[in-house]
Amino acid sequence: MSESKNRALFLDRDGVINIDSGYIWRPEDFLFNDGVFDACRAAREMGYLLVVVTNQAGIGRGLYSEQDFHALTDWMLAQFRAEEIEIERVYFSPTHPEEGIGIYRRESPDRKPGPGMLLKARDAFNIDMSRSVIVGDRETDIQAGINGGVATRILVEGEEDDPASSQADVVVGSLAEAVAWLSERENA
């Protein structure tokens, strides 16, 4: 008998979990979006593993270090744990193909729209991509989902992209709305 596969809710960080106010690397600059904890709790109750997939070009551009990113990530995960919410893992891509410095100036399959982070999570957590969802605030997140075979793609409307031209399955205003949409769809 084969082991059953998990389904995941892949979350972009900046713009989905927190307010995207530019390159964020300090806890004092990190503001959670309204409803994030309740939405993540509801998604866990629906059986989704929570996996964060985030481009962090600020590292590649020399604006902050990988150590700064990890310190902020540890702080963020502690906030989730305080709310009794488990995030399976945070994957990040520090590269930028044009504006990266040194080792960070390169193409990477991990940098969205590449599917590398999604595929690493798939392999690490036995994830069935055909039952999984990605939520992002940019079309590059949606494209990463397509490239990684993620069945459902949800765009949180932001300032960057035109929702009318998105390849997302649905466009919503927040992660809370995304999880509510998933819940309604599953209970239909």
Roles of regions detected by a PLM:
Residues 45-48, 91, 171:
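Ser/Thr/Pro/Gly-rich low-complexity disordered regions
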Residues 16, 59, 63, 137, ...:
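Gly/Ser/Thr-rich helix-start
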Residues 25, 58-63, 100, 142:
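Short, solvent-exposed loop/turn segments at secondary-structure junctions
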